[in-house]
């Protein structure tokens, strides 16, 4: 007994099925081309179930499906190949990187700020202590300078006293400073001459030159002493200088009187009448 043959499909039904398969193939090619051009963009996964247009319609009979060309129907009926799942990017810190370095978190930044402030305070305190020590050193130096200045004044007074005593004890005159000129004329002191005795006027006439010479010598001595006093650079006068000068003048005057007395006082010849033996 031979099996019954299936009736041949209608030509219009074959044409519609072929058009539908061509459309499905064209869509799959477009999708593959789109994936090749944009591989990085993730494509939403398609459900395993076939799309509505791939499922056989209720009106299509099993015989129509069997009559479709296997080369076309095989690729059309199979679901399109799924693209490989791309690995999900690892989740990094929420803060973006700037200039190749990751910015610090708020806590780390606050800790660094506190450390910087602490170091600044320490430097400021050390600098203040250093300045205080320098101020103390300057105060000590000022006190020492004042003490040295007072000692210098005392030593200057002492040197002036020594110079005045040297001038009194020795006749050496120190070197004349450049700002003092001793060539200026000075008024000479007039010394009163003693009045001659009435009984000895004739006898005292010849030796009158000796007291005048002594007076001129005294004047010269006083002038030289005045010059020495001018050369003392403002040195204080010795308290006994005037007394010394007056005593010296009186002594010289007394010596002049003594030299004049022997010539003035002559012994009268005796009245006994005998000749005198010289």
Swiss-Prot record:
Residues 1-121, 173-278 are annotated as: Disordered. Residues 56-68, 215-226 have a biased composition (Polar residues). Residues 103-166 form the bZIP domain. Keywords: DNA-binding, Nucleus, Transcription, Transcription regulation. Residues 254-269 have a biased composition (Basic and acidic residues). Residues 1-10 have a biased composition (Pro residues). Signal peptide: none annotated. Pfam families: bZIP_1. Residues 109-119, 198-214 have a biased composition (Low complexity). Residues 104-127 are annotated as: Basic motif. It is found in: Nucleus. Residues 131-162 are annotated as: Leucine-zipper. GO terms for cellular component: RNA polymerase II transcription regulator complex. One of its GO terms (molecular function) is DNA-binding transcription activator activity, RNA polymerase II-specific. Its main location: nucleus. Belongs to the bZIP family. Putative transcription factor. This is Putative transcription factor kapC.
């Amino acid at each position: 007994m031979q099996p019954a043959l299936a009736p041949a499909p209608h030509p219009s039904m074959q044409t519609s099925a072929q058009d539908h398969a061509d459309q499905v193939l064209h869509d799959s090619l477009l999708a593959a081309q789109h994936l090749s051009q944009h591989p990085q963009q993730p494509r939403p996964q398609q459900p395993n179930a076939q799309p509505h247009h791939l499922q056989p319609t209720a009106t299509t009979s099993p015989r129509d499906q069997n009559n479709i060309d296997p080369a076309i129907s095989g690729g059309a009926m199979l679901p399109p190949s799924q693209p490989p799942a791309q690995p999900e990017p690892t989740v990094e810190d929420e803060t973006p990187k700037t200039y190749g370095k990751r910015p610090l978190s708020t806590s780390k930044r606050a800790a660094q700020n506190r450390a910087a402030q602490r170091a600044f305070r320490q430097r400021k305190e050390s600098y203040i202590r250093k300045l205080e020590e320098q101020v103390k050193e300057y105060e000590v130096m000022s006190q020492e300078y004042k003490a040295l200045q007072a000692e210098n004044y005392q030593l200057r007074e002492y040197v002036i006293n020594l110079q005045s005593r040297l001038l009194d004890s020795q006749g050496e005159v120190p070197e004349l400073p450049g700002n003092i000129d001793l060539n200026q004329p000075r008024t000479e002191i007039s010394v009163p001459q003693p009045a001659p005795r009435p009984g000895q006027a004739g006898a005292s006439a010849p030796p009158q030159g000796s007291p005048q010479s002594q007076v001129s010598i005294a004047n010269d001595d006083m002038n030289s002493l005045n010059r020495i006093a001018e050369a003392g650079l403002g040195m204080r006068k010795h308290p006994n200088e005037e007394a010394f000068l007056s005593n010296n003048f009186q002594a010289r005057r007394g010596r002049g009187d003594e030299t004049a007395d022997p010539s003035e006082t002559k012994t009268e010849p005796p009245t006994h009448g005998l000749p005198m033996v010289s």
